[in-house]
From Swiss-Prot:
SUPFAM superfamilies: UDP-Glycosyltransferase/glycogen phosphorylase. GO terms for biological process: lipid A biosynthetic process. It comes from the Bacteria. Condensation of UDP-2,3-diacylglucosamine and 2,3-diacylglucosamine-1-phosphate to form lipid A disaccharide, a precursor of lipid A, a phosphorylated glycolipid that anchors the lipopolysaccharide to the outer membrane of the cell. It is an enzyme of class 2 (transferase). This is Lipid-A-disaccharide synthase. Pfam families: LpxB.
């Protein structure tokens, strides 16, 4: 190729900015004159992204917020598609944010531009008909998890499993003692991490439940200590309110979920992406979740997977206990977690095997997959 390689990327949130910057760095190592255009956050801009508008304009969550910004989002997407068709990049890479990026990929592919989607939406679990749109709009799907790749292979979508960047970042073994010393916790006494979620609704539904379970654990193990990472100042205030009137020996952290996990012996955790982090730190866990009864009723009928937590989806078996809705009682949570504080070997052995599968140098794998799609050498 005589002219410099031009790659368009769009990320819609902070996690996508992290993935995008790693991919850009790996691509630059192979093709130093590559030019990047599209939409990215500060990390992608630091790697040389010429962002058409701030990524924050795409970072919306929740139905109400999306509806309030729908006109702006649709207008930005329309303008972005036209700009990219005019620019004719060698490839477009949509990073996560499927409700925004999949439509862009479809239109660009119809215009003759190669397209890649990085991070699979949860089509294997529900709304499986979305795979038809993915197959039509996507030249290549890059997945972080192996079971996702198997799903796409069965559906006839070109796919490459690249591994998970978290598995590259988190060491195979972590230093529990050093982390406890950093937090001023005893090296010898048992510590349980409580992780009721990062959103206000999750903490509202699970916070008091987790604290009730913690009080029952404390009766059985009087020397027990607890640690809870708060995702934001708002969540910390919410947690402090829920703790009023309780006498739990608990250390609250501002963010730093990795510190809480490195320090603990076991974790009581909300179902979600944090369970993957707990798995990678090899911490035995009990997964719990509660949602509005109607939401639970609807999801039970829509979701095709037998499991809800990532550890079980990755293991393809019931590796960690899942206590959902009415099954998630303080007594059941405490009773299920208690033996894991002493011996979670059956879980952690499985966690280690999964960590090694996911640890594939994801950014470099993704860069090689993109260059192979373009028929370019993997290095100059």
């Amino acid at each position: 190729m005589t002219s410099p390689l031009r790659i368009a990327l769009v990320a819609g949130e902070a996690s996508g900015d992290i993935l995008g910057s790693g991919l850009m760095r790996a691509l630059k190592a192979r093709h130093p004159d590559v030019r990047f255009i599209g939409v990215g956050g500060p990390l992608m801009e630091a790697e040389g992204m010429q962002s058409y508008f701030p990524m924050e304009r795409l970072s919306v969550m929740g139905l109400v917020e999306v509806l309030g910004r729908l006109r702006e989002l649709l207008a930005r997407r329309k303008l972005l598609v036209q700009t990219l068709i005019d620019e004719k990049p060698d490839v477009f890479i949509g990073i996560d944010a499927p409700d925004f990026t999949l439509n862009i990929e479809l239109q660009l592919r119809r215009a003759g531009i190669k397209t890649v989607h990085y991070v699979s939406p949860s089509v294997w679990a529900w709304r499986q008909k979305r795979v038809l749109k993915i197959r039509e709009g996507c030249d290549l799907m890059l997945t972080l998890l192996p079971f996702e790749a198997r799903f796409y292979e069965e559906k006839g979508v070109p796919v490459r499993f690249v591994g998970h960047p978290l598995a590259d970042t988190i060491p195979l073994e972590s230093d529990r003692g050093a982390t406890r010393a950093e937090l001023g916790l005893s090296v010898d006494g048992p510590v349980v991490a409580l992780m009721p979620g990062s959103r206000g609704g999750e903490v509202g539904r699970l916070g008091a439940l987790f604290f009730d379970a913690a009080e029952r654990l404390l009766v059985e193990r009087p020397g027990l200590r607890f640690v809870l990472p708060c995702a934001s100042p708002q969540r910390r205030a919410q947690v402090e309110q829920l703790l009023q009137g309780r006498d739990l020996p608990i250390t609250l952290l501002d963010g730093r979920s990795h510190v809480a996990l490195a320090a603990c012996d076991a974790v009581l955790i909300a179902s979600g992406t944090a369970t993957l982090e707990a798995l990678l730190y090899k911490r035995p866990m009990v997964v719990a979740y509660r949602m509005a009864p109607l939401t639970f009723w609807v999801l039970k009928r829509l979701v095709k997977s037998p499991y809800v937590s990532l550890p079980n989806l990755l293991a393809q078996r019931l590796l960690v206990p899942e206590l959902l809705q009415d099954d998630a009682t303080p007594e059941a949570l405490a009773r299920t977690l208690l033996p894991l504080i002493e011996d979670g070997h059956a879980q952690t052995e499985g966690f280690d095997a999964i960590h090694r599968i996911l640890r594939r140098d994801a950014s470099n794998q993704a860069a090689d997959a993109v260059l192979s799609l373009l028929g370019l050498p993997l290095s100059l």
